[in-house]
Amino acid sequence: MELLLDFPTIGEPHYAQAIPASLLTEKQIKTFDLATNADPYAALSESATGVTRSGRTVHVKMTSIRSHFMPDNIEGVQVGDSVYFHITNLEQDWDVPHGFAITGLNNSELLIMPGETRTIVWVPSKVGVFPFYCTDFCSALHQEMQGWVRVSPRGSSVALVANKPSSK
C-alpha cells in the first residue's frame, strides 16, 4: 500500500496560536461561591448528603468532587421507584465539571458545572446492582469516581440507606 499523504487533522493542537493570558483572565470567573447555590436540593457539604423516600419517589442528595461521589453506596431502592439524583458539584475551580451516568437513564448523562446542582431521574426496571460513574475526565483519579445502587424487588423490606462521610 502506498502512503499518499501524512498530516495532522484539522484542529491539531500544534497549530494553535498563543494570546496573552491577560486578555482572558479579567473576564473569567475563577471560583464559585457555593453559598449562592439556591437549589432546594443542593448539598453544600458531604455531611448534607443523604437519601429519603416518599412513597415510590426517592431523593438522593449527592455531592461530586475530585475524585468521588458522596454517597457512593445506596441500598433500598425498589424496582419502579422514581429516583431523583440531585448532584452538587463542590468544585471551586472554574474548569472542573463532573458528569453522572447510570445504566437505564432515558438520556446519556448529566453534566454538572462547578458550584451547580443538577437533577436527573432514573427509574430502575429490574433487580440488581447498578454502577454509576463520572462521565467527564476531572483528574488522574477520575476512574475512582463511581458508586453503586442496589435495587430490590417492589415491596422489599431492605432499608433505604446510603453511606455517609467518615468523621476523620
What are the residue ranges of the model-derived segments?
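Solvent-exposed coil/turn segments that connect beta secondary-structure elements
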Residues: 65-67, 82, 88-92, 105, ...
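Hydrophobic residues in beta-strands and at strand termini
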Residues: 62-64, 77, 87, 102, ...
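Hydrophobic membrane-insertion alpha-helices, especially the h-region
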Residues: 1-3
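Exposed beta-strand and adjacent loop surfaces of beta-rich binding modules
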Residues: 82, 97-99, 129
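Histidine- and aromatic-enriched segments that form or immediately flank copper-ligand environments
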Residues: 86-116, 140-147
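Extracellular/periplasmic metallocenter environments
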Residues: 5-7, 11-24, 32-54, 112-168
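Beta-strand-rich interaction surfaces with strong enrichment in secreted/lumenal proteins
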Residues: 72-75, 107-111, 121
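N-terminal edge beta-strand
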Residues: 50-82
